[in-house]
Amino acid sequence: MSVTPVACDITTAAGQQQVLQACPTPDILINNAGGPPPGDFRDWDRDAWIKAVDANMLTPIELIKATVDGMIARRFGRIVNITSYSVKMPIDVLCLSNGARSGLTGFIAGLARSVAAHNVTLNNLLPGVFDTDRQKTTVAALASQRGVSLEEARKAKVAAIPARRMGEPAELGDACAWLCSAQAGYVTGQNLLLDGGLYPGTF
């Protein structure tokens, strides 16, 4: 196996072309964009909304559009979008993310069913609180906001999770690998939560 890194702005047509030139006929597509910044929706102008929708909804759709027909022709394809548990459990300060990612979720729900007969699956992974650099930044902001130590802020965040811990990045990778496998061929159009039980609903 060889890995070909491509440094580009994937939200642009030129960036997408660079990626597809490096791998023109992928059997597996994983879309993963960093979340838009938190804040108050009153402070965001139209450009902020367009940027969020472009990165977290339109770019994945463009990449799916460029690759799904080849998957259909080869009768195998796996598409996974890494979004957020906020799709099912919206976070008040992440309205940009809530809106853009929910739009992608709705799009996938329809498309997944239209290509399922060709052994092409489309699913979304919805990670909760994972022990990543981004989470460290979030914990630091929480500590500053509450006037507590980093350790106290981290403990408060973990206490809200029934599993009483943050997720490990490898756990997300394992779940993604399974969705991309032949063994997951009967799973499509789904939103798989990896949140340690944080979401309180039944479906």
Predicted features by range, described:
Residues 33-37, 197:
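Conserved NAD(P)H cofactor-binding loop of Rossmann-fold oxidoreductase domains
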Residues 40-42, 48-53, 79, 157-158:
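Substrate-binding pocket helix/loop in short-chain dehydrogenase/reductase
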Residues 64-65, 109:
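A short, exposed helix-loop element centered on a Lys and neighboring polar residues
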Residues 69, 113-114, 185:
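Alpha-helical segment proximal to the catalytic Tyr-Lys
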Residues 80-103, 108-117, 129-130:
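Catalytic loop of short-chain dehydrogenase/reductase
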Residues 89, 177, 188-203:
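Short C-terminal tail/terminal secondary-structure segment
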Residues 116, 121, 187-189:
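Short, small/polar-rich loop/turn modules that mediate ligand/substrate recognition or access, typified
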